[in-house]
């Protein structure tokens, strides 16, 4: 814990110094001076930040130059693993583990230049993406610890540290938010928390014996192709639902929020994306079905959790089938969700305002987003137990050696406010990913993808009247699909590191054709151990 505090102090000093950069040099804004050891680390970090664009350009040039090399692509060798090192020395059974530990760190820095917008935060509405140039960053460090509890049972603990600065206080974008690591309500002051504490029990039912390799959130083991799995505790529902080989983790692939899962999948979770609850999975060879019930936040997009799982909850069910087409692996899934939460319907908020103009965005004393538009309806006046439903489909398919395509689409009812994920009511995503075997860099990854998000007609009417939801609301709207293009190249180097350059082009930010387009340029450094 002393090490975490020491690192947190370094990050706090860096962020505090940046905030004070525009002030006279005689002020420190209350930021304490670093210790000699912290000062040395700061020098290294500053050198790294100043040289990162040059290094990235060199690596990318080397990667594409290697593509011209006609040498056969080698298979990727294993990166450094502490668990593998112990196994090599006879100190650990990595195939049937009693425990393991892994870690990761990721730093993501984004910049958007100024863009065109005829209005911003019109009439006191507050959820516009600011048209001025902005910088954003996230820094995370995570430790994954797993232990064998008894036969078939595993326990996991995952502490995490995060520091962040979003564009425009994380306002003005739907599913096109450029960095999934961003959390609602996060700050540049480093925060340490546990992201997961859960138990998993597996019951074998026969079939083929399969090997599960050691990794984060997975002990190395053997299990039956036909089995039952039960999970209980604190986790992300995306640890089990809508997982896939291509784009599940923004730390390795696409950075955009809409590529993590269905943009319209308003899965119940706190502001960090985690929940409490249970999941049950049934595997039968190439088929799987899973169900889960998890906790929502007490208020939309906030951190405190409502543990009344029989009153407010998020339910989901997913059916999965794995297949091969011409010996190329693929997968299809269908997912449905049903949430019961204390949330407002757009039509009820509009009706309340039209019946009494005093029930506007500035007068409600319950939970609200702080809009200053006295001429607009507000969801605060409409919150009561309501249900949100949606259904989606997903498919992924290898179409060649280390080349794959994927797509997903979801339709949600669009009658109630966003409670945890994005403002999308309908969403669709397609993408193409390639590993670098063809140009002799087998651990490099390149990808291009497109993401679309729509809102319902009643949602658009509410925003057009000046209302805001958890993420969007310019004060007026020319309703249109929010579109984003994401292009990235991730270069692997020195065994455990990846350096990524990413470009995103966002059209109709906040579902508003009157504003934008927006360009976002991002550099990411990621290490895993």
Regions found by a protein language model. Give the residues of each.
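Outer membrane beta-barrel transmembrane domains
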Residues: 318-320, 335-385, 406-408, 413, ...
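Residues that define the transmembrane beta-barrel architecture of outer-membrane proteins
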Residues: 97, 135-141, 190-195, 272-276, ...
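Residues on the lipid-exposed face of transmembrane beta-strands in outer-membrane beta-barrel proteins
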Residues: 103, 141-147, 197-201, 232, ...
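Outer-membrane beta-barrel "beta-signal"
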Residues: 71-72, 195-208, 517-529
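Surface-exposed coil loops of outer-membrane beta-barrel proteins
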Residues: 172-189, 193, 208-318, 467-477
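Short loop/turn motifs that connect adjacent beta-strands in outer-membrane beta-barrel proteins
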Residues: 89-101, 112-114, 146-155, 204-227, ...
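Transmembrane beta-barrel strands of outer-membrane/channel proteins
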Residues: 105-109, 157-161, 230-234, 291-295, ...
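N-terminal periplasmic/intermembrane-space "pro-region" immediately following the signal or transit peptide
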Residues: 58, 64-133, 144, 148-150, ...
């Amino acid at each position: 814990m002393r090490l975490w505090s020491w690192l947190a102090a370094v990050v706090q000093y860096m962020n505090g110094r940046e905030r004070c950069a525009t002030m006279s040099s005689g002020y420190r804004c209350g930021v304490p001076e670093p210790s000699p050891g912290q000062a040395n680390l700061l020098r290294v970090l500053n050198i790294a930040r100043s040289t990162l664009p040059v290094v990235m350009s060199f690596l990318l040039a080397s990667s594409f130059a290697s593509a011209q090399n006609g040498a056969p692509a080698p298979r990727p060798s294993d990166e450094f693993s502490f668990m593998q090192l112990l196994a090599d020395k006879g100190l650990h059974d990595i195939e049937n583990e009693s425990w393991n530990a892994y870690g990761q760190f990721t730093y993501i820095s984004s910049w958007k230049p100024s863009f065109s917008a005829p209005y911003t935060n019109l009439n006191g509405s507050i959820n516009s993406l600011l048209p001025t140039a902005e910088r954003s960053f996230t820094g995370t460090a995570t430790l994954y610890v797993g232990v064998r509890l008894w036969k078939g049972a595993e326990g996991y603990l995952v502490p995490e540290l995060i520091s962040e600065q979003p564009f425009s206080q994380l306002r003005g974008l739907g599913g096109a938010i450029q960095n999934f690591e961003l959390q609602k309500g996060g700050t540049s002051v480093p925060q340490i928390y546990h992201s997961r504490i859960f138990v998993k029990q597996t019951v074998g039912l026969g079939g083929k014996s399969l090997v599960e390799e050691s990794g984060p959130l997975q002990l190395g083991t053997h299990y039956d192709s036909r089995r039952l799995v039960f999970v209980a505790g604190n986790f992300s529902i995306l640890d089990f639902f809508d997982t896939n080989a291509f784009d599940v983790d923004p730390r390795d692939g696409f950075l955009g929020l809409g590529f993590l899962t269905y943009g319209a999948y308003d899965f119940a979770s706190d502001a960090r994306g985690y929940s409490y609850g249970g999941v049950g999975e049934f595997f039968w060879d190439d088929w799987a079905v899973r169900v889960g019930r998890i906790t929502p936040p007490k208020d939309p997009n906030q951190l405190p959790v409502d543990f009344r799982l029989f009153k407010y909850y998020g339910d989901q069910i997913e059916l999965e089938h794995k297949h091969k087409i011409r010996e190329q692996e693929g997968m299809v899934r269908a997912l449905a969700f049903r949430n019961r939460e204390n949330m407002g319907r757009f039509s009820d908020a509009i009706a309340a305002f039209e019946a009494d103009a005093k029930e506007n965005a500035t007068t409600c004393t319950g939970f609200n987003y702080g809009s200053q538009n006295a001429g607009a309806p507000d969801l605060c006046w409409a919150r009561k137990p309501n249900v949100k439903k949606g259904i989606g489909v997903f498919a992924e398919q290898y179409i060649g050696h280390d080349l794959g395509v994927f797509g997903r689409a979801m339709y949600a009812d669009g009658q109630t406010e966003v409670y945890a994920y994005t403002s999308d009511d309908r969403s669709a995503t397609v993408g193409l990913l390639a590993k670098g075997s063809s140009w002799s860099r087998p651990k490099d990854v390149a990808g291009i993808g497109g993401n679309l998000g729509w809102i319902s007609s009643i949602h658009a009417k509410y925003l057009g009247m000046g209302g805001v939801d958890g993420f969007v609301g310019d004060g007026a709207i020319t309703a249109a699909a929010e579109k984003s293009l994401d292009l990235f190249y991730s270069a692997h180097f020195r065994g455990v590191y990846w350096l990524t350059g990413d470009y995103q082009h966002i059209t109709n930010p906040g579902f508003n054709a009157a504003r934008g387009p927006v360009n976002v340029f991002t550099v990411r450094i990621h290490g895993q151990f």
